[in-house]
């Protein structure tokens, strides 16, 4: 049973990485800026992975837009999600959100990448980890923009991933650096932060969800990424979510309360995660592949494997054909203009 997504050290594939990626526990990989030099190089790296690892791998990236865009040179400057509401009219917002989703997904698929973890469904912009990665502080606006962004992704042939369930926007701490605590009541969380996830699930827009490394102390003592309450009781049963549940990166400091890397992996799986990200911790990856034991014949593991198959890209796009497309050309200019205007607005406030 494949469950781990791991990372690569650099711009070329190492033999140790071929062996790790070939391990039965490993389902795929996530790419970072350190793996990228230019488009030709990243395409060659992906081609090497596909050829040298003799099984289908889910290749992923965080190419959200704004400050979270791993590949820049030679790619569209994608706007931060907040930029749509801050720089455009109501009609333009939904139109360009859809185009941004399509543009991002089409460019990644043309590299032979299956999935970009997007969109961010957190509300508000105060959290250091989120900031302008979120669409809005308003539920209705965030949902409307997210629907259009996802529709663009789906049109290009990419599955969507809503993050960070049930909402990371109301904590100031950064879960990359520590475990944040959200002390609001259950009613406050369910009436606000949970709403984008609940509404998008109801409209069948989300193919995958990534929970937060945040402890919601009035609801459960575990981070959502390791919480049966959030993942089994709320996400699966109450919201009837049928898609894939990714853990956020188990190498992050916010996951540290769940123990060592093997313990974190076990807790996330037992809580209900299907696929586990473990990045920037090569020794941790080795510990997990050596010590995590999974039973292949259990029904919920079989369901996890079936859900994994729905995440692979749904079409093939040739890069040269893409950049010759008028839609891509118009988006390349217009989306960059939106981000430049947003950066100018931010600079003027300083």
From Swiss-Prot:
Pfam families: Glyco_hydro_3. The record marks 174 as: Important for catalytic activity. Its EC number is 3.2.1.52. It is found in: Cytoplasm. The active site is at 176 (proton donor/acceptor), 248 (nucleophile). It catalyses: Hydrolysis of terminal non-reducing N-acetyl-D-hexosamine residues in N-acetyl-beta-D-hexosaminides. HAMAP family: NagZ (MF_00364). Plays a role in peptidoglycan recycling by cleaving the terminal beta-1,4-linked N-acetylglucosamine (GlcNAc) from peptide-linked peptidoglycan fragments, giving rise to free GlcNAc, anhydro-N-acetylmuramic acid and anhydro-N-acetylmuramic acid-linked peptides. PANTHER family: BETA-HEXOSAMINIDASE, BETA-HEXOSAMINIDASE-RELATED. NCBIfam families: PRK05337.1. Belongs to the glycosyl hydrolase 3 family. NagZ subfamily. This is Beta-hexosaminidase.
